[in-house]
Amino acid sequence: MYAPIRSPITELNESTPSSIPVATSYATCSASFAKLVALLVDDMAGLSIVLSEIYIYFKLLFLIVITESIQNKLEDIVKEYKKRGIDLGIITNVDEVSLFFDTSQYAEAIKKKVIEIVRQSGTGRAKIDFKTNGYVIKFAIQRGYYNRNTIEKLKSLVDYLHEQKIRCGYEIKGDLIFVMSLTDFLQKISEDVKEKLKDERVKIASKQEYTKYIVVIKVEQ
């Protein structure tokens, strides 16, 4: 890519006789010195460019190696959560790795269960609004579509989800509201990521993409 860097001394020797007469004038010495300085400046500029390229190359190489290290550790987390029925994924860029998981399937499964409970209660077909606010997902069951049997079944569902470390509950304010919070779910994965990458020099942040219910845990170097 680059021509060999020629030493300024080599350049000077090639263009200067092997022995300089004693009578060499001051002007000749000054010219030789000026040429030496010019060669030094040129070579240092070239060396600077080469060093810059080497720095960039090693920086990119370093980032790629570290990214692979981080990615391998994140893949371990993906496998662990896969066993629990939770799908995670990894997005890799040159300078960052993002771990993401899709909460829609997780929330939709619970939504279907709530609908099933309400329909089985014998009170007719329930209309359930699926809303999000931060990490809180609400299922609003309209008035007249729930009874004691419905509430008992929802209590059982809430108890089951609590056993799965999912914070949720219900409240009755005219309509019956079933509330599920994914905050703890996200926090648990974030803690696992931090623990797994504790030996890496990374910054970890998380955010939620509200449009697709995608939660992203970003790992930056």
From Swiss-Prot:
Q: Which UniProt keywords apply?
A: Host membrane, Membrane, Transmembrane, Transmembrane helix
Which cell locations does it reside in?
A: Host membrane
Q: Which residue ranges are assigned to the Cytoplasmic compartment in the record's topology?
A: 67-221
Q: Where are the transmembrane segments?
A: 46-66
**The keyword Endoplasmic reticulum appears for this protein:** no
What membrane topology is annotated for this entry? Answer: Single-pass membrane protein
Q: Which residues lie on this side of the membrane: Extracellular?
A: 1-45
Mind telling me what this protein is named? Uncharacterized protein ORF221
Q: Which organism is it from?
A: Acidianus filamentous virus 1 (isolate United States/Yellowstone)
